[in-house]
Amino acid sequence: MAASKLMQEIHSIGDRLLLKLQRLPQAEPVEILAFSVLVVFTATVVLLLLIACGFCCCQYCWPRRRGRRTQVGPMTPP
């Protein structure tokens, strides 16, 4: 029952989005600007996620540079 309601909700959201896209050429400039801002924001988030995932995946492929380690001893009193 819950799966069918979820599918109906997704279908109704898709229908509303399609209707908005069809009415966009006749929309007011404010609506076009708001829609453009939402599209740019969504694209930016997706792009940043792809960059982050790519960086995390590729980071483990490269050999890590290990510097020379120096041992630290206790300080001698002056």
UniProtKB/Swiss-Prot annotation:
Compartment(s) of residence: Membrane
A family per Pfam: SMIM5_18_22
GO cellular component, one term: membrane
Location (main, coarse): membrane
Keyword tRNA-binding: no
Protein name: Small integral membrane protein 5
Source domain of life: Eukaryota
The entry's keywords: Membrane, Transmembrane, Transmembrane helix
InterPro entries linked to this entry: SMIM5, SMIM5/18/22
Keyword check for Transmembrane: yes
Membrane topology reported for the UniProt record: Single-pass membrane protein
Lineage, opening ranks: Eukaryota, Metazoa, Chordata, Craniata, Vertebrata
Transmembrane segments: 32-52
Signal peptide: none
